[in-house]
């Protein structure tokens, strides 16, 4: 559970028509995207052992009953690279873009990008906090910001 109000960011730049949007109807990922829309980072685990499953499995997975739970929203930069060329035209306005693998406090490693920080300020092990970027009225993307700026009451 998070102990603070979620932070929602909006972009001043209109969403590029080629921006890849997730399939919100995908039955495996639907709870993740619904949670993000509510400002919650949801992860999946086994109900009995609390063993984390990321990426998530279908709920009918045979080995053990699964459940979604609200993660702390805190993590550290496990790995990163700075993109100076857009991998899609939709990301041109974000360059240079710090792409990262964030390891959450719970142990999930999420591929993401970092916001509210300069590329030269990113480092391995950097504490980060999830923030939510509103892409459309239906799609909200969990992204990550340095924990220091998040804790200072940053609002975007």
What spans do the regions from the language model cover?
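Short, basic/aromatic beta-hairpin or loop at an interaction surface
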Residues: 94-110
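Short, conserved secondary-structure segments in the cores of folded domains
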Residues: 32, 67-68, 100, 118
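A broadly conserved sequence feature marking short terminus-proximal activation segments
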Residues: 1-41, 145-147
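Well-ordered alpha/beta subsegment
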Residues: 107, 111-156
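Cys/His-rich short segments
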Residues: 34-74
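Short, conserved beta-turn/loop elements at beta-strand boundaries and strand-helix junctions
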Residues: 80-86, 133-137
């Amino acid at each position: 559970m998070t102990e603070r109000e979620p932070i929602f960011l909006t972009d001043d730049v209109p969403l590029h028509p080629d921006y890849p949007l997730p399939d919100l109807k995908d039955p495996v990922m639907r709870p993740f995207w619904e949670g993000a829309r509510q400002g919650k980072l949801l992860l999946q685990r086994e109900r009995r052992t609390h063993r984390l499953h990321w990426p998530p499995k279908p709920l009918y997975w045979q080995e053990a009953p699964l459940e979604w739970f609200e993660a702390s929203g805190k993590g550290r930069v496990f790995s990163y690279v700075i993109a100076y060329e857009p991998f899609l035209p939709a990301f041109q306005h974000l360059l240079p873009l710090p792409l990262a693998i964030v390891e959450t406090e719970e142990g999930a490693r999420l591929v993401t990008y970092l916001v509210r920080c300069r590329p030269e300020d990113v480092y391995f092990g950097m504490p980060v906090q999830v923030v939510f970027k509103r892409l459309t009225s239906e799609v909200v993307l969990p992204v990550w910001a340095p924990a220091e700026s998040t804790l200072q009451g940053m609002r975007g």
